[in-house]
A protein has these predicted regions:
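Cleavable N-terminal signal peptides
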Residues: 15-16, 26
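A residue-level marker of the well-folded mature domains of exported/periplasmic proteins
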Residues: 2-5, 10-11, 21, 29-327
């Protein structure tokens, strides 16, 4: 090869390499969002079978209406497969951005990646996806929600203090594979593991559902009549557990303590009634924070990988004062 040809080849190779690197860097970033007065956005809800989800949906719809945005809303009815299809439908409809509350961490990865490929930014709200498979700032913009691990930790710490570090515990888990179920279990279980006088004798999913929580609690109470505590990953299952305890001829709040998460109105009423010991808040009113994040992102502002909500803790000392503000 002549000197001239070699030089020309090297220049071409450098240029090609720069183009490839540029493309790789561009693909390593989450899709951009153009600045507009109004947006057409999608909200892919996971289900609508409990007060928490209904409150979240109401907040997202109300804030979109307030801003004058067009909202494409879908309800996956508890199906990860349908939620993936819902996101694909939003992509086909040409939405500007997608707000996704993933039912489970792994099955919703294809939906996130499909939106990225289509150039549509995704904002995860309430629930997260598997962090080993998708990254904030690269595959989606950010996660907006509560610190589920901290929620579980707070529930565990309250229980240690209340029981003096002695308890036989039944755990009612949320939807299998979901980030709140995974993290609320970890946060709580880690606290219990540090207290030798406390033992989790059974842990089973109640799918965040009141009636399923009741059924699972009934079964586990029969298998473990020595249980003194039920930890539920949400108030709906805790309320189901109250019914199960009463059906077993025991007194909730006395014979068996219950601690849970969410802070819904029925949960706070159960605290007032002395049946539920405490509930860690997980605020469902995401509308203002979700849309504010999108507006800031469009303006080019730096969005953190996680936008963590500030939640409260409810027990007998404040439930009566706070119930009017609950959902």
């Amino acid at each position: 090869m002549s000197h001239f040809s070699r030089r020309k080849f090297l220049k071409s190779a450098v240029a090609t390499g720069a183009m490839v690197l540029s493309a790789q860097l561009a693909f390593a970033e989450a899709p951009k969002l153009a600045v507009k007065a109004k947006y057409k956005v999608g909200f892919a809800q996971t289900e609508s079978n409990n007060p928490w989800r209904l409150a979240q949906t109401a907040s997202m719809k109300a804030e979109a209406e307030k801003l004058g945005w067009q909202l494409v809303y879908t309800d996956a009815a508890g199906s990860a497969a349908k939620q993936v299809a819902d996101v694909n439908s939003m992509i086909a409809q040409g939405v500007d951005a997608i707000f996704l509350s993933p039912r489970e961490e792994k099955p919703l990865i294809p939906a996130v990646m499909a939106a990225k490929k289509a150039g549509i930014p995704v904002f995860l709200i309430d629930r997260n996806v598997d962090q080993t498979l998708a990254k904030a700032g690269e595959d989606y913009v950010t996660f907006i929600g509560s610190d589920f691990t901290l929620e579980g930790k707070q529930a565990g710490e309250w229980l240690v203090k209340t029981t003096g570090g002695k308890a036989v515990i039944i755990e009612l888990e949320g939807s299998t594979g979901s980030s709140p179920a995974n993290d609320r279990k970890k946060g709580f279980d880690d606290v219990i593991a540090q207290n030798p006088g406390m033992k989790i004798v059974a842990s089973q999913t109640g799918d965040f559902n009141r009636d399923k929580g009741r059924q699972v609690a009934e079964s586990l109470l029969q298998a473990h009549p020595e249980a003194t505590v039920i930890y539920a990953h949400n108030d709906e299952m805790a309320i189901g557990a109250i019914s199960a305890i009463e059906a077993a001829g025991k007194v909730p709040g006395k014979d068996i303590l219950i601690v849970s998460i969410d802070g819904e109105k029925d949960g706070l009423q159960a605290i007032i009634d002395g049946k539920l010991g405490a509930s860690v808040e997980c605020n469902p009113k995401f509308g203002p924070a979700a849309y504010a994040a999108a507006i800031a992102y469009a303006k080019g502002e730096k969005i953190p990988a996680k936008v963590v909500n500030t939640d409260r803790f409810f027990d007998a000392s404040n439930a009566a004062k706070m119930i009017t503000d609950s959902y």
